[in-house]
C-alpha cells in the first residue's frame, strides 16, 4: 500500500513565502483600485451638485444664489439645491454630499485651526458629519473665507468671462490646501488634488496651488494660483 507523501517543512515555507509575495504585490494594486473608486464616486457627486446648481440658476434668471450668512456662504447653498436632487430641505447626512475618502480627523489641531473662523470649529471625524460644514464634504465657491470678496454668489452665468476656469463648487478640502484622496504630512501641502466643478459644468480632479504659509492665513481660497494652473476662484 502506497503512503501519501505530505508536504515537507521546506515546501510549506516556500508556499507561505509565495503567498506573502503575491499579497505584497496585490495590496498596492487593491489600494489604488479602492482610491480610484472613491474618487469616481466623489466626481459623480460633484457633477450632480453642479447640475443642481445650474438647475437652480435656470429657475432664478440664471443668477446664482445670494447668501447673507457670510459664515456659511460656502456650505448653506445645500438648502437651495436639495429640491433639484429629489431631497427634502433640512436633510443632514446624505451620501450624495459625502466624499467616500473624507475621513479627516477634525480633532487634529492642524486641521481644527483651519476652521477657527467657524463657531464652534468642527470636531470628530469627517467634514460631512459636521454641522458647521452643513453635513457636506463639498462647498460652494460663494465668497472668500473671512472676506468681502464675492466669488460666484449673485453672478449671472452669462456674465462669467471664463466659465471653464471659474470654480463653482467642489471639495471643501481644496479651499484649505488639503486632499482627501492624496494624504500627506503636513496636511496642507503644494498641489493637493481635489475634485472641483466649474461654471461651464465640467468636473476635474485638479492640483490646488498653496503658497506655503501654514494655517488659516495660507488657505488657497485666499489667493489666485500662478500661471500653469487651470482654475481661478474669482473674476477680477
Specify the residue positions occupied by each region the protein language model found.
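N-terminal single-pass transmembrane signal-anchor helix
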Residues: 2-34
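Short, well-structured segments within or immediately adjacent to enzyme catalytic domains
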Residues: 40-236
Amino acid at each position: 500500500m502506497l503512503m501519501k507523501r505530505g508536504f515537507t517543512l521546506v515546501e510549506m515555507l516556500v508556499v507561505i513565502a509565495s503567498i506573502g509575495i503575491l499579497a505584497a504585490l496585490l495590496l498596492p494594486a487593491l489600494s489604488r483600485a479602492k482610491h480610484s473608486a472613491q474618487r469616481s464616486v466623489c466626481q459623480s457627486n460633484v457633477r450632480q451638485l453642479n447640475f443642481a446648481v445650474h438647475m437652480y440658476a435656470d429657475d432664478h434668471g440664471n443668477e446664482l444664489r445670494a447668501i447673507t450668512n457670510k459664515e456659511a456662504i460656502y456650505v448653506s447653498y445645500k438648502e437651495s439645491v436639495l429640491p433639484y436632487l429629489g431631497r427634502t430641505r433640512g436633510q443632514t447626512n446624505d451620501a450624495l454630499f459625502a466624499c467616500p475618502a473624507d475621513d479627516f480627523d477634525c480633532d487634529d489641531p492642524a486641521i481644527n485651526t483651519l476652521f477657527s473662523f467657524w463657531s464652534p470649529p468642527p470636531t470628530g471625524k469627517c467634514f460631512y458629519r459636521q454641522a458647521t460644514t452643513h453635513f457636506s464634504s463639498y462647498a460652494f465657491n460663494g465668497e472668500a473665507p473671512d472676506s468681502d470678496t464675492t466669488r460666484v454668489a449673485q453672478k449671472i452665468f452669462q456674465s462669467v468671462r471664463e466659465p471653464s476656469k471659474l470654480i463653482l463648487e467642489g471639495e471643501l478640502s481644496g479651499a484649505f490646501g488639503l486632499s482627501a484622496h492624496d494624504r500627506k504630512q503636513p496636511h496642507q501641502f503644494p498641489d493637493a488634488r481635489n475634485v472641483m466643478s466649474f461654471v461651464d459644468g465640467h468636473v476635474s480632479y485638479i492640483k490646488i496651488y498653496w503658497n506655503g504659509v501654514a494655517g488659516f492665513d495660507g488657505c488657497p481660497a485666499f489667493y489666485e494660483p500662478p500661471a500653469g494652473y487651470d482654475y481661478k476662484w474669482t473674476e477680477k
